[in-house]
Design a protein with these regions (language model features):
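Conserved beta-loop-beta element that borders a ligand/cofactor-binding pocket
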Residues: 110, 143-163
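N-terminal Rossmann NAD(P)H-binding glycine-rich loop of SDR-like oxidoreductase domains
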Residues: 3-22
Length: 296
């Protein structure tokens, strides 16, 4: 297949690109990042504009979006976060709609932040949208992709664990014994190994009846307290420092909701269509990611 990936230079996009190329697909990457590090990946084509595309596209992965944690959420930054997702998705959909041949499927980025903080409630794809700013951001991002008139899948992604992503800033903290539980540690984290995220994305690409939202998480969410214990055990480090919730809220303000919010998302629809996880237990996922690094 001929596949376009927007945001292909990011953590998820790079892993997805390698998997697609590995199975023989032609991959076109549209990216704002034109640095040598990003362009060094073995994509079939690198693009800085949709107008450079000169032949029909079979499928699109829309993964564009600025990092939610890289800067404080000022009013200007919030506009950037929305524009990098919603405005760019609207531009993509408008461009695709004008082509003589539309893609067969659009798989658009999303997040379990759609549900917001819902405490102990188990959340499936049928659960209601949350009410905080991040939940509205995700809901509007999905809506921006909704009007192309082709099969559309929303990749409601949980916390992706791999060599990079969430673990990159956490690993040095845990190695220094500073990776203790956040707040009371009782909130839920819905996670997924990077390899399973890629496999699920490909499964949804190839599964012609898959449509609408899918939670891309492991079937076994954990409380953050357990996440911290498993991290410490894998790295052979004590877990003792526990920053209080009030301090995190003071330092991070609205962004603290992404760390302290409880989102117990379950991948009900992936299970219903027969997807199989390689890493369904957090301890196994962390061992696979962290042990090779520790031994190298």
């Amino acid at each position: 297949m001929r596949i376009l990936i927007t945001g292909g230079s990011g953590f998820l996009g790079q892993a997805l690109t390698q998997a697609l190329l590995g199975r023989g697909d032609e991959v076109l990457i549209l990216s704002r990042d034109t640095s040598s590090n990003a362009r060094n990946k073995q994509a079939s084509h690198w693009l800085t504009s949709l107008e450079e595309i000169d032949a029909p596209i079979d499928a699109v992965f829309n993964l564009t979006g600025a990092n939610l944690f890289s800067r404080p959420w000022t009013k200007a930054r919030k506009r950037q976060l929305r524009d990098s997702r919603i405005a760019l998705t609207e531009s993509l959909v408008n461009w695709l709609a004008k082509q003589t041949q539309a893609p067969r499927v659009l798989l658009s980025g999303s997040a379990i932040g759609f549900y917001g903080d819902q405490g102990e409630r188990e959340l499936t794809e049928q659960s209601a949208q949350g009410h905080d700013w991040a939940a509205k951001l995700v809901a509007d991002w999905e809506q921006a992709a909704a009007n192309l008139g082709v099969r559309t899948v929303y990749l409601r992604t949980g916390l992706v664990l791999g060599d990079g992503g969430l673990l990159q800033p956490l690993r040095p903290l845990f190695k220094c014994g500073m990776g203790g539980s956040l707040g009371d540690g009782q909130f839920w984290y819905s996670w997924i190994h990077l390899q399973d995220w890629v496999s699920a994305a490909l499964y949804l690409l190839d599964h012609d009846s898959a449509n609408g939202p899918f939670n891309l998480t492991a079937p076994t969410p954990v409380r953050y307290e357990q996440f911290a214990k498993d991290m410490g055990k894998t790295l052979h480090r004590p877990v003792w420092l526990t920053p209080p919730a009030w301090l995190l809220k003071l330092l991070l303000r609205e962004q603290a909701s992404l760390l302290l919010g409880s989102t117990k998302a379950l991948p009900q629809r992936l299970q219903q269509i027969g997807f199989q996880w390689q890493y369904s237990q957090l301890s196994e996922a962390l061992e696979a990611i962290l042990k090779p690094t520790e031994n190298s």
